[in-house]
Amino acid sequence: MKKKLILESGEVFHGEGFGADLETAGEVVFNTGMTGYQELISDPSYCGQIVCMTYPLIGNYGINRDDYESIEPAIKGLIVKEICDLPSNFRTQITLQELFKKKNLSGISGIDTRRLTRILRNSGVVKGKIVNADADENTTVEELKSTTFPTDQVDQVSTKTSYANPGRGLKVVLVDFGSKLGIIRELSQRNCDIIVVSHDTTAEEILLMDPDGIMLSNGPGDPEDNQQALEMIRGLLGKVPIFGICLGHQLIGLACGAKTFKLKFGHRGGNHPVLDLEKNKVAITSQNHGYAVDQESLKGTDLIETHIALNDRTNEGLKHKIHPCFSVQYHPEASPGPEDANYLFDDFITLMEDFKK
């Protein structure tokens, strides 16, 4: 089926549709990963976004039962140069096309993804829409310009009810802003007794659970849209150790008086170098975020910058001067990507153990 991708800036890309035969609109972003498309599709942080894969051939190893990061995809669409029709991997169960049909998702292949990525890199992320080949381009552009996307992405992907993932070790309350299953896997491997709660849970409700530590998960959207979470974090600081990842990192920054801003085209992929300022060591990290903590705004707060991105020198890590609280902008659980930084989960375990003494 013939499809085309139309950007609000007027550019049009013609290609072949795959998956469900439907039109879909979202914020168009790019991801530089060569692999990990299954985790990407099921990552709640991509809620409302159409993702362009910069690597030219996607779908090579199909879809398996193990690599999902959530039960239902939140992604709006996928853009690839070429989609693999005959995947080859011993774990393959279905093809990428079959997954998109099953989950009622729309994608487009056969377009110049290098040109699209250059547009996004130079102009910044834009709104876009995958439409049928006969759709009127001028009308679609005007629709995109006048469209305001929802700002309740966290509410869309957060759990609605609390649930437990039992373990024999330290009790961790995981606040779900759109958490990947990889975070739960890393905590479970360290025998943590995990309770997953909704993003709108209050500090008082969390403290009644008597946790040893709080994990603030990744999630989609603008961190400033989560004012209730800031009150929750302020109510927990100093009372229990806190570890924030991605959106959780940004929320800690806001809760402590810093500011955030929207990046031009974000960091998305499994090959982003980050410098640990305390250890003077570089880790290759998995990242997926369109916002960052403003480094200038850290002045006058109780936060210390601990990590920076080597590509653009933006903030990638924070630590509280007084309270047991730290966070990183990238994904130490990887899923997908390098596991250089999963030692941070061990640091969190140590922080909780020391706090109990």
Label each region the model flagged:
Residues 1-204, 208-209, 223, 335, ...:
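RNA-binding accessory domains that recognize and position tRNA/RNA substrates
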Residues 106, 171, 241-243, 259, ...:
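Proline-centered loop/turn at the N-terminus of a beta-strand
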Residues 112, 246, 289, 331:
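Active-site glycine-centered loops adjacent to acidic/histidine catalytic or metal-binding residues
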Residues 166-172, 279-282, 320-325:
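Beta-strand-turn-beta hairpins that frame and shape the catalytic cleft
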Residues 169-173, 193, 241, 284, ...:
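Residues that mark the start of a beta-strand
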Residues 171-176, 285-286, 326-330:
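Active-site-proximal beta-strand elements of phosphoester/diester hydrolases
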Residues 213, 217-284, 292, 337-347, ...:
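Cysteine-nucleophile active-site neighborhood
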Residues 281-323:
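Catalytic beta-strand/loop cores that center a nucleophilic Ser/Cys/Thr
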